[in-house]
Amino acid sequence: MHAPAPFPTRRAGGLACLAAALAVAAALALAGCASTPVAPAATAAPAPARATAPKSAPKSALWVGNSFFYYNDGMHGHVGQLLAQSRPGEQGYRSASATIRGTGLNWHDVEALFKPAGVGPYPFDAPTAVLSDNGDKPFDVVIMMDCSRCPLQPRLAPVFRDCAARHSATVRRHGAEPVFFMSWAYADRPGMTEPLAAAYVRAGADNHARVVPAGLAFARSIAARPDLNLYVADKRHPSLMGTYLAACTVLGSVYGISPVGNAYTAGLPADAAAQLQSVAWQTVQGFRQP
């Protein structure tokens, strides 16, 4: 990890990266297994609407990944807050997070997470601990992310593809749907956007799974508003703005709900939250699922 230091954010780099990701996605689309992000657009917020979503909105989710998920008190918690504001009066959203810092998908035993009390709270009934049991189908969706550079490394990319296939099969065997979370480029390595997008789109196509285009949302945001800092000082992990942008992208991609106008802002300035909501929704609307 780099020592904390200030860093510049360059609009031109964001535009170039997003354009490159567009080119790759378009090529994959011609091959019959890709998504097509749209180019940066005006920042005016579109009217709230619904994107194409699963047949039934997930009521529960398991997040499997690394520190990109658990920074800022956990991305899953922010998604829960966004859902609570977008679905007033509906039964609560349930989630669990299985994350290990700096790890890839090959570190996770997804099968074990589906066992009774495999993951979840431990309520106590004195004097005996009663383990939670969420039944035969503890989760509706499992949102998975590999380590930030694993899909790009020649020796680790095959491991990513293998784990994507094995974990998808495990998730479906337990009655849930797999979802792949496309991670973002490092602030000082914008060229990561294109190959990461290609790797996750390919994984989604190979396994008939949805993809959350968070990496493309980051590139779009940087291109449109470089003053909104999406990273902490290490230039890799998300700032609160970065986590919020990613959570808004999950809301649109997995639940088909527009984040635009959502009252939950994670304590961010209203104008910044509105911009991030808009960028997330624009990205989701312009992204064709594999």
Task: Show which residues each predicted segment covers.
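Sec-dependent N-terminal signal peptides
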Residues: A12-A26
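Conserved SGNH/GDSL esterase-like catalytic core that processes O-acyl groups on lipids
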Residues: Y70-R155
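Conserved catalytic region of serine esterases and O-acyltransferases that act on ester linkages
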Residues: P40, P46, H237, A247-P290
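N-terminal secretory signal peptides that target proteins for export/translocation
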Residues: M1-R11
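Alpha-helical cap/lid subdomain in secreted, periplasmic
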Residues: D125-L240, G252
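N-terminal module-boundary/linker segments of secreted carbohydrate-active enzymes
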Residues: A45-Q85
